[in-house]
Swiss-Prot record:
GO terms for cellular component: virion component. This is Uncharacterized protein CP312R. Induction: Expressed in the early phase of the viral replicative cycle. It is found in: Virion. Belongs to the asfivirus CP312R family. Keywords: Early protein, Virion.
């Protein structure tokens, strides 16, 4: 019999992906992914919202789901949070108008690292002589996207197998595969390169970004001899915050980080599975210099960090 150890743990992306792929092949996501329905938690500010812990088992280790990722390319623009910045950005680039952000900022990652070949409309994927759409090979797939895609399947499977007493089993997708049906152009058309989003949470009480954002272009040596990085700051030396984050995280920047996916959320809108970048150990930079999250923090350091963070 396999003994499963309950602990706080940061799952390795490669091991998590392999476990999820095997579970899918065996049509048995429950061997890796489960929801703790017996321990519903109520949100502090809204008693109609409930949380359920997500547990994952990989190589005999069972823990609420947190996992790392490395060398992933963020795409798109983070909208600004102020009217002044909207005016400035639209004046600088009137061809690509932005609106003021009305929710937490997000990192965005495509399914493919390179775009599929497209027709002149910029949306239709070209076809080969056999009439098949041409997509990049497996080696061009984002590892993070593959994990999220499988987590979406495991999440839906677990919800459908949930208690019969649940008022709803409507799940909110983790991945955007179509253009919004409210878009002015091309509404509801398939995206040639689907998008997954990771939320950069803002503390509503303090208006401070929850994750620690580090600048990989500015390495520092800690007292224990390990390499870390300076906190991400703007040109005036102000640390990353809700009002300047759109300037600091640019499209095509490369990211490492740790994702908190420890709970699903049940509300009147349905059941969602928030993926949040609120564990710290996040770097935002434009070039990969070969130093990854694991070289900055040991597993003990990460466990200490995680235990300091209050989860709803």
């Amino acid at each position: 019999m396999l003994l499963v150890k309950m602990t706080t743990h940061i799952f390795n992306a490669d091991e998590l992906l392999q476990a999820l792929q095997q579970a899918k092949a065996e049509k048995n996501f429950s061997s890796v992914f489960s929801l703790d329905w017996d321990k519903l938690r109520t949100a502090k500010r809204n008693t109609t919202v409930k949380y359920v812990t997500v547990n994952v088992i990989v190589k005999g280790k069972k823990a609420p789901l947190m996992f790392n990722f490395q060398n992933e390319k963020h795409v798109g623009t983070i909208p600004p949070s102020t009217d002044e910045e909207v005016i400035r950005m639209n004046a600088e680039n009137p061809k690509f108008l932005v609106k003021k952000r009305d929710r937490d900022p997000c990192l965005q990652f495509n399914k493919y690292k390179i775009s599929p070949p497209l027709e002149d409309d910029g949306l239709t994927v070209k076809k080969n002589e056999q009439g098949e759409e041409i997509y990049p090979g497996d080696e061009e797939k984002s590892k993070l996207f593959q994990i999220i895609e499988l987590l979406e399947e495991a999440f839906e499977d677990a919800v459908q197998k949930g208690p019969e007493t649940m008022k709803t089993k409507h799940v909110i997708k983790l991945i955007q595969r179509k253009i919004s049906n409210s878009a002015a152009k091309n509404a509801d058309k398939p995206l040639p390169n689907p998008i997954a989003r990771i939320r950069i949470k803002i503390n509503s009480g303090t208006n401070i970004l929850t994750p620690i954002l580090l600048n990989k272009s500015k390495p520092i040596t800690l007292q224990n001899g390990k390499t870390s990085f300076e906190e991400l700051k703007d040109e005036d030396g102000v640390k990353a915050n809700p009002d300047n984050i759109h300037k600091l995280i640019e499209s095509h920047s490369i990211h490492d980080g740790i994702i908190n996916a420890r709970s699903i959320c049940i509300s009147n809108m349905g059941i969602s599975f928030p993926l949040c970048l609120e564990m710290g150990v996040v770097k935002v930079f434009e070039k990969n210099n070969g130093i990854n999250v694991d070289s900055i923090y040991s597993s003990d350091d990460i466990s200490t960090l995680v235990n300091q963070i209050a989860i709803a």
